[in-house]
Every structure is written in structure tokens, then in C-alpha cells.
């Protein structure tokens, strides 16, 4: 893998029971120009034949099944399978606009290591966010920026892209590690997006925000739970800050 002005782009789409949405989303991604290198659908043991729908809709799609459970594990499986130079994180529900993919890639080509989507950067927006979620997001942005010295305006948005050569630095759980008898591995759940935001900041990587407009999901109901998810993000921020401090202390001893 190499960094160039014309990178190969891998789009990773975690999915669980999103068959109807995939029938709309996959052709839209495939229509993006410049064309993406590959689309990887990572299925979370769906019961609605999401993999079958993906393959019928787009025969050249790469469809795999995640090794454990949780969105974070699905992402890690997709990242490990990616063969492109750039990895784009893309939700299956239709809330992200595939036409924005070139803007994320352009930010990376221009010098960023991590392109962070933001609904609150100039030119961004949302058809879906509530006042309560907007307020909570702003508070969590403040915590993240105070802890990590960042300038995030939209910590909780999952539309992001990064150079694939950064994967070792992110230190995500190995997809081949067996699932624990109880609970989940850290990073396997919905905390994955916050974990990534924290780790790229702790590593001192170059972060560029990309304006993005969030749309309403096409079919189905959202899994978002405002208070529970906000609490989880806050716990993740504190945990990742402690992790960064431990690593910094370990480096100073050597």
C-alpha cells in the first residue's frame, strides 16, 4: 500500500439486517467517480439475507461475515480485509452520502492522515439529529478536545476515512481473537468510532474535518439511544485518555 495522488479506495460497510438499504446504498457507492477500488460489506449475522441482497445488487461486492459481534468488530474485520490505500467507513442505513467520498479522499491526498466527517463544519448539516443529540454531541466534543488537544466539531459522527497504512497504529482487537465467554473485547462495540478518534489524536496524526450532510435512514429503525450512547462515549473518552497516559509514561521510561 502506498500514499499517492490517486489512491485505491476501499469502502467498508458494516451491516446487520440492512438488506433493503443495501439495495439502494451499494449502487450509489458504485456510481461514485472516481470509482472506488472495492466495497466490503461486513455482515453481523443478519437474519434478513443481507449478504445475499448485497451480492444480488452488486455482484462484485466483497461480502464477509464478522468474526465476533459488535460494530467495532465488523469494522476491524473490514479494515483487515481491505486491499486499498484508503479506507472509508460507511454506514449501511443510507444516512451517509456516497457523493462525499471524493471529498474525504481529497483531504487525505492533501496531507491529512485521518479525514473526520463533520455535520457542524461549514457546509455540513443533518436531516436527522435532534436538539438533545446536538447538545450532547457538543458537550462530548468539549471533553474530547480538552483531553486530547483536538478541535473536533462532531466527535459522534461515524463517516470517516484514513490511510490504510495507519492500521497498526490504531491497535484494534485482532479479528481472529476468539470471543470472550462473557462480554465483548474493548473496541468491538459501538465505542469503535470514539476509540479511533482518540487514538489518531493520541498518536499525533494529522486530522482534517470534512463537511458532511447526514440524511435520514432509508428503511428501518435507528439503534441510537441518546443517553446510553452518550454515557458510553464519555466512558470511552476517559478510558482512552488513561490508555494514552499509560503509553506516554511507558515511552518515557525507555
Predicted ranges, named:
Residues 26, 30, 36-45:
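Short beta-strand/loop segment that forms part of the nucleotide-sugar
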Residues 8-10, 38, 195:
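Cell-envelope/extracellular polymer assembly enzymes that use nucleotide-activated donors
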Residues 43-51, 94:
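A conserved acidic beta->alpha catalytic loop
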Residues 1-30:
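N-proximal low-complexity "stem/linker" segments adjacent to membrane-targeting elements
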Residues 87:
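Short aromatic/hydrophobic "clamp" motif used to bind/position activated sugar donors
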Residues 188, 194-215:
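Catalytic donor-sugar/metal-binding loop of nucleotide-sugar-dependent glycosyltransferases
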Residues 37-40, 51-81:
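Conserved donor nucleotide-binding strand/loop of the catalytic core
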Residues 67-69, 73-81, 98-186, 190, ...:
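Acceptor/aglycone-binding surface of glycosyltransferases and processive sugar-polymer synthases
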Amino acid at each position: 500500500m502506498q500514499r499517492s495522488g490517486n489512491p485505491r479506495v476501499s469502502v467498508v460497510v458494516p451491516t446487520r439486517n440492512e438488506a433493503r438499504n443495501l439495495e439502494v446504498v451499494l449502487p450509489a457507492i458504485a456510481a461514485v467517480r472516481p470509482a472506488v477500488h472495492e466495497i466490503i460489506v461486513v455482515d453481523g449475522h443478519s437474519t434478513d439475507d443481507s449478504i445475499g441482497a448485497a451480492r444480488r445488487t452488486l455482484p462484485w461486492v466483497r461480502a464477509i461475515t464478522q468474526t465476533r459481534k459488535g460494530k467495532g468488530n465488523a469494522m476491524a474485520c473490514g479494515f483487515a480485509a481491505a486491499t486499498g490505500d484508503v479506507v472509508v467507513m460507511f454506514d449501511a442505513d443510507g444516512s451517509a452520502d456516497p457523493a462525499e467520498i471524493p471529498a474525504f479522499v481529497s483531504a487525505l491526498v492533501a496531507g491529512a492522515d485521518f479525514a473526520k466527517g463533520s455535520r457542524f463544519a461549514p457546509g455540513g448539516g443533518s436531516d436527522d439529529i435532534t436538539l438533545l443529540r446536538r447538545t450532547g454531541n457538543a458537550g462530548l466534543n468539549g471533553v474530547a478536545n480538552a483531553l486530547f488537544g483536538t478541535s473536533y466539531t462532531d466527535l459522534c459522527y461515524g463517516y470517516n476515512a484514513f490511510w490504510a497504512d495507519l492500521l497498526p497504529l490504531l491497535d484494534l482487537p485482532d479479528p481472529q481473537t476468539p470471543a470472550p465467554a462473557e462480554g465483548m473485547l474493548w473496541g468491538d462495540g459501538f465505542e469503535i468510532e470514539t476509540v479511533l478518534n482518540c487514538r489518531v489524536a493520541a498518536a499525533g496524526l494529522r486530522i482534517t474535518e470534512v463537511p458532511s450532510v447526514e440524511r435520514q435512514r432509508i428503511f428501518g429503525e435507528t439503534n441510537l439511544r441518546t443517553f446510553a450512547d452518550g454515557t458510553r462515549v464519555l466512558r470511552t473518552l476517559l478510558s482512552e485518555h488513561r490508555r494514552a497516559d499509560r503509553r506516554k509514561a511507558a515511552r518515557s521510561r525507555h
